[in-house]
């Protein structure tokens, strides 16, 4: 049974699944779909077009699906799409996409967005991400599965954060961060691989050893990036993890953070 507090404002055209709960003074707009089991606390605002999956927890004063902060936006019906099992804490803002971009902002499954995080237009987030308080993404940013952003980390538009990467507190990121790499600093620089995170996720010693070798090849041998890529292909072709790093290099548009 759907439970809507009498002081909530839910547009009759909104579609809410079974066991959705909406707290007092929350506002749900007309072109919003919320799947079963999602809990929405008090004073949240969800505008559309927005699609939200199952079993999410959306806390007070979150603002989801508002128009993008983009001067070229002319009211096009772009979307925000949120998957299943996410936790979205107080004052988080997630904006819809733009017609000039992907037309949607997409957030995957089982992510944890702490208070005051900002997800701008046309971003694409994977699964099992952790964003600490006030981490912010500019437009068109991609973040791979299991990545972590520390509090107050800022990511420049069109950057990519690879799977299992770790971006420390207050990092300013203006280039692509490869998979498995740890970066930090006001103008972020690399500091090795995310060994703690990899161990926590069950990576074997052999996998971590190969990733460390790849990191040293990219960052510690003074090679041009093209030469480092070639060395990875020759020396570590057996490693699917390293191949993922090579693919990331090949698809980089802004260049790697080095």
UniProtKB/Swiss-Prot annotation:
This protein's pathway: Glycolipid biosynthesis; lipid IV(A) biosynthesis; lipid IV(A) from (3R)-3-hydroxytetradecanoyl-[acyl-carrier-protein] and UDP-N-acetyl-alpha-D-glucosamine: step 1/6
Record Pfam families: Acetyltransf_11
UniProt KW keywords: Acyltransferase, Cytoplasm, Lipid A biosynthesis, Lipid biosynthesis, Lipid metabolism, Repeat, Transferase
Keyword Transcription regulation: no
InterPro entries assigned to the protein according to its UniProt record, in alphabetical order: Acetyltransf_C, Acetyltransf_C_sf, Lipid_A_LpxA, Trimer_LpxA-like_sf
Molecular functions per Gene Ontology: acyl-[acyl-carrier-protein]-UDP-N-acetylglucosamine O-acyltransferase activity
GO cellular component, one term: cytoplasm
Chief place where the protein resides: cytoplasm
Subcellular location: Cytoplasm
Catalytic activity: a (3R)-hydroxyacyl-[ACP] + UDP-N-acetyl-alpha-D-glucosamine = a UDP-3-O-[(3R)-3-hydroxyacyl]-N-acetyl-alpha-D-glucosamine + holo-[ACP]
EC number: 2.3.1.129
Gene3D superfamilies cross-referenced by the UniProt entry: Hexapeptide repeat proteins (2.160.10.10), Udp N-acetylglucosamine O-acyltransferase, C-terminal domain (1.20.1180.10)
GO BP annotation list: lipid A biosynthetic process
Annotated family: Belongs to the transferase hexapeptide repeat family. LpxA subfamily.
Function: Involved in the biosynthesis of lipid A, a phosphorylated glycolipid that anchors the lipopolysaccharide to the outer membrane of the cell.
Assembly, per entry: Homotrimer.
PANTHER family: ACYL-[ACYL-CARRIER-PROTEIN]--UDP-N-ACETYLGLUCOSAMINE O-ACYLTRANSFERASE, ACYL-[ACYL-CARRIER-PROTEIN]--UDP-N-ACETYLGLUCOSAMINE O-ACYLTRANSFERASE, MITOCHONDRIAL-RELATED
Full protein name: Acyl-[acyl-carrier-protein]--UDP-N-acetylglucosamine O-acyltransferase
């Amino acid at each position: 049974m759907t439970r809507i507090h009498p002081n909530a404002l839910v547009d009759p055209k909104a579609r809410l699944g079974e066991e959705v709960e909406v707290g007092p003074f929350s506002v749900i707009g007309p072109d919003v779909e919320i799947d079963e089991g999602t809990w929405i606390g008090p004073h949240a605002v969800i505008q559309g077009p927005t699609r939200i999956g199952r079993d999410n927890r959306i806390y007070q004063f979150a603002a989801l699906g508002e128009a993008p902060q983009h001067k070229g936006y002319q009211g096009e019906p772009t979307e925000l799409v949120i998957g299943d099992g996410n936790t979205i804490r107080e004052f988080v803002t997630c904006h819809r996409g733009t017609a000039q971009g992907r037309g949607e902002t997409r957030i995957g499954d089982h992510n944890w967005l702490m208070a005051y995080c900002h997800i701008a237009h046309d971003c694409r987030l994977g699964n099992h991400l952790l964003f600490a308080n006030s981490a912010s993404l500019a437009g068109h940013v991609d973040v791979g599965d299991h990545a972590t952003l520390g509090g107050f980390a800022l990511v420049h538009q069109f950057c990519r954060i690879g799977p299992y990467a770790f971006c420390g507190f207050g990092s300013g990121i203006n280039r692509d961060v490869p998979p498995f790499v740890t970066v930090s600093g006001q103008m972020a620089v690399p500091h090795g691989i995310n060994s703690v995170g990899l161990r926590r996720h069950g990576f074997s010693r052999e996998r971590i050893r190969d990733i460390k070798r790849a990191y040293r090849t990219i960052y510690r041998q003074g090679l041009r990036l093209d030469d480092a890529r070639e060395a990875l292909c020759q020396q570590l072709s057996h490693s699917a993890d390293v191949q993922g790093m090579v693919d990331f290099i090949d698809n980089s548009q802004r260049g790697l953070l080095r």
